[in-house]
Amino acid sequence: MRLEVEARLRLGSFAIDAAFGSEGGVTALFGRSGSGKTSLVNIIAGLLRPDQGRVVLDGDTIADSERRLFTPVHRRRFAYVFQEARLFPHLSVRGNLAYGRWFAGAARSGPEFGRIVEMLGIGHLLDRMPSKLSGGERQRVAIGRALLAFPRLLLMDEPLAALDDARKAEILPYLERLRDETRIPIVYVSHSVAEVARLAERVVVMENGRVKASGKTAAVLNEPFPTSGPGRREAGALIEGIVDSHDEGHELTVVRAGDCLIRVPHLVAEPGQRLRLYIAARDVMLATRRPEGISALNVLPGTIVGLSSPRQGSIDVRVDCGGNVIAARVTTLSRDALDLRPGKQVHAVVKTVALDY
C-alpha cells in the first residue's frame, strides 16, 4: 500500500516543505526535536491543513490543495498513537479497547479482538483501570485501541519517548510483532536512531522542515561518512543478525552477525529470530592488538576499509568485521598514533551496555 505525501505549510517563522513516498511497512520520520516530524505527521492525520500539498494512500486522494479536497480527520480512517497513551481514565482496559471497536463495528472487530489482545500481551490487563498500568502497558493498550478501529494507516508520534529504558525494552518486541503480523502501513515518528534501526524498513530524515534524506533504512543509516543522513553525532552502523542464545545468568543475549557474536543486554526474542542492531560510532574504540583485561565484552577483529576527512579533531573509521561494517569515531591523534589506514587489521571494541535499547 503506497503512501504519497507532499506538504507546504508555514507555522509562524517555521515552514514545512517536504515530500516523501513509502511502500507500506514501517516508515520512520526521523530527526531532532523541532525538525518538523510531528507537524508533518499531523498534516497526514488531517490535524493540520497544508497551504499546498496532497496526501494519497493506495491511489485514494485524501487531501489535495489544488483540487480543494480535504477529507476530515474522522473520515480518513487513520489511527494515531501519541507520546502519552491518552486512555480514558474512567474506563477499564476492556472499555478503552471497546472504544476502538466501536469505530469498526462490533461484528467486524469481534474475531480480531482476541488476536490483537494476544499479540500485545494485554489479556491479563483487561479488567484493570489505566491508573493501575505501567507506562509501557498503557502504550500497549493505546496501540490495541488504535488497531481495533481497523485503520488504513497507523500514525505513531514518538510512542516510546515518555518511557524509561526498561519500559522501552518491554514494548519494542510488541512493536516488532505489530510490524511483522499486520499489513497496516505505519508512519513512525522518532528521534532515536536505535528505534528507527530496529523497527523501520524506510526512513525519512527531517531537518528544518525539509526532507534531508530518504530511502531504505540500511542505506540511509549506513551512509559511509554522513552528510545527509542521521547526522554526525548519531552516525554509526546498522547490523543485521539473528538471536543465537541467551545468557540468563547475566541477563545477556548473544546475537550472531555474519562471523561475529555480539553480546547485548537481554532481549525478549527467540533463538533464530532476525533483528537489527545500531552501533553508534561514538561507542566504538579501536585497538591494533586484541586488548586483555577489559570490561567490554565485544572485541571484534576486522579490517579498516575507509576513513573520513577530519572534522573538529576527529574522524570516522569504517571497519569490516566478519561481513558487517562498523564505524568508529576516533581523534586524529589516535589515527596518527595507531597508524590507522585502509587495509590495516584492528579490533573494534564495543561495550555491551552501549547497546541497551
Curated annotation (Swiss-Prot):
Belongs to the ABC transporter superfamily. Molybdate importer (TC 3.A.1.8) family. Pfam families: ABC_tran, TOBE. This is Molybdenum import ATP-binding protein ModC. Gene3D superfamilies: 2.40.50.100, P-loop containing nucleotide triphosphate hydrolases. Residues 293-357 form the Mop domain. InterPro entries: AAA+_ATPase, ABC_transporter-like_ATP-bd, ABC_transporter-like_CS, Mo/tungstate-bd_C_term_dom, ModC_ABC_ATP-bd, Molybdenum_import_ModC, Mop_domain, P-loop_NTPase. Its main location: membrane. The complex is composed of two ATP-binding proteins (ModC), two transmembrane proteins (ModB) and a solute-binding protein (ModA). SUPFAM superfamilies: MOP-like (SSF50331), P-loop containing nucleoside triphosphate hydrolases (SSF52540). GO terms for cellular component: plasma membrane. It is a peripheral membrane protein. One of its GO terms (molecular function) is ATP binding. Its EC number is 7.3.2.5. Part of the ABC transporter complex ModABC involved in molybdenum import. Responsible for energy coupling to the transport system. It is found in: Cell inner membrane. It catalyses: molybdate(out) + ATP + H2O = molybdate(in) + ADP + phosphate + H(+). The gene is modC. ATP binds at G31, R32, S33, G34, S35, G36, K37, T38. NCBIfam families: modC_ABC (TIGR02142).
